[in-house]
Amino acid sequence: MPRTQRNDNFIDKTFTVVADILLKVLPTSQREKQAFSYYRNGMSAQAEGEYAEALQNYYEAMRLEVDAYDRSYILYNIGLIHTSNGEHGRALEYYYQALERNPSLSSALNNIAVIYHYRGEQAIENGQSEISQILFEKAADYWKEAIRLAPTNYIEALNWLKMTGRLTGLAT
């Protein structure tokens, strides 16, 4: 089950060592330890661009993990992979599932907004201005919530909201 460390990144190696120590000393069940090991292996594979391997590890982690909060991060990372592969519809499904388990996951809200904004831009290119406005409004709603949860994390989104007059309903 342990993944060989192919990445020479000091931070990744340090994380792996610390995670291994924590797994040994924390009072967790064998199932929880296995779930975390799969999750960690998934993150390592994802960082190296090995998306198929990362997905396999994340699916195994999902099979074993029972904690909703921990599952939210697994689902979020699966969404990231689908986003990277241009599978935006599938990515949205996983981001929504992550938010069901962890409504404070601002990065999932941000990524949903980014996808809606991208789709809005595509609609403009296709001459569908009404659809683009609907998509931009959806993006704005998700960005406002992400900014509400993490006010300093999404400066570009905040600027876009200001420039497009969509800042209403957000205390800044």
From Swiss-Prot:
Sections of the chain in a coiled coil: none
Compartments, as annotated in UniProt: Plastid, Chloroplast thylakoid membrane
Mode of membrane association: Peripheral membrane protein
Keywords: Chloroplast, Membrane, Photosynthesis, Plastid, Repeat, Thylakoid, TPR repeat
GO biological process: photosystem I assembly
InterPro entries in alphabetical order: PSI_Ycf3_assembly, TPR-like_helical_dom_sf, TPR_rpt
A Pfam cross-reference name: TPR_1
PROSITE patterns, per database record: TPR (PS50005), TPR_REGION (PS50293)
Residue ranges of TPR repeats: 35-68, 72-105, 120-153
SUPFAM superfamilies listed in its UniProt record: TPR-like (SSF48452)
Origin superkingdom: Eukaryota
GO cellular component: chloroplast thylakoid membrane; thylakoid
Function field: Essential for the assembly of the photosystem I (PSI) complex. May act as a chaperone-like factor to guide the assembly of the PSI subunits.
Family, similarity comment: Belongs to the Ycf3 family.
Protein name listed in UniProt: Photosystem I assembly protein Ycf3
Species assigned in the record: Chlamydomonas reinhardtii (Chlamydomonas smithii)
Gene, per the UniProt record: ycf3
